[in-house]
Amino acid sequence: MKKRIIIGNWKTNKTQKEVKEFFKILNASLKNKNICCTFGVAPVAIHLELAKSLAPKQMIIAAQDANYISSGAFTGTISWSQLKDIKIKYVIVGHSERRMYYNETDDIVNKKVKNLLENKMIPILCIGGNIEEFNNKKTYQVCATQLKKA
């Protein structure tokens, strides 16, 4: 059977206080429970270390994105090497919002996937079309292309 992993993407939500409250409630609700699946969250980058410190040990803390270049003049991005340094193993790549708002192409997604794999990290690949592609019944074709190019 394939391993299933459930990751909640927090996008640009939650303050430090809200992160602490989330994990307080989560940890209390998981007490003495047998968890039958692998699960995690992808908080905004500034909360990664806080989330790691508060999360139950079996929980995955993932990054929402990573630059495929390890360092340099890339204001506002976080590099795979910075994530690896704080022991973040999972990284979301190819999210529709990154494709739409930051013009990330299939080629950029491919570079990110390859770079993460080369550095023994795990990409969480997002594929999917937009509403126009859905209405034109091109979702399958778009997903197949994105998957192939990644």
Curated annotation (Swiss-Prot):
Q: How does it assemble?
A: Homodimer.
Q: What is this protein called?
A: Triosephosphate isomerase
Q: Give the UniProt keywords, A-Z.
A: Cytoplasm, Gluconeogenesis, Glycolysis, Isomerase
Q: Which reactions are catalysed by this chain?
A: D-glyceraldehyde 3-phosphate = dihydroxyacetone phosphate
Q: Name one GO cellular component term.
A: cytosol
Classification via Gene3D superfamilies: Aldolase class I (3.20.20.70)
Name the Pfam families for this protein. TIM
Q: Which CDD domains match?
A: TIM (cd00311)
Q: What Gene Ontology biological process does one annotation of this record name?
A: gluconeogenesis
Q: Give the principal location in a single coarse category.
A: cytoplasm
PROSITE patterns in the cross-refs:
TIM_2
EC number, as in UniProt: 5.3.1.1
Active-site residues, Swiss-Prot/TrEMBL: 95
Localization per Swiss-Prot or TrEMBL: Cytoplasm
Q: Which organism encodes this protein? A: Mycoplasmoides pirum
Against PANTHER family, the record matches this protein to:
TRIOSEPHOSPHATE ISOMERASE (PTHR21139:SF42)
Summarize where substrate binds, as residue positions. Answer: 9, 11
Pathway participation: Carbohydrate biosynthesis; gluconeogenesis; Carbohydrate degradation; glycolysis; D-glyceraldehyde 3-phosphate from glycerone phosphate: step 1/1
Instruction: Tell me the superkingdom of the source.
Output: Bacteria
Q: Which family does it belong to?
A: Belongs to the triosephosphate isomerase family.
GO terms for MF: triose-phosphate isomerase activity
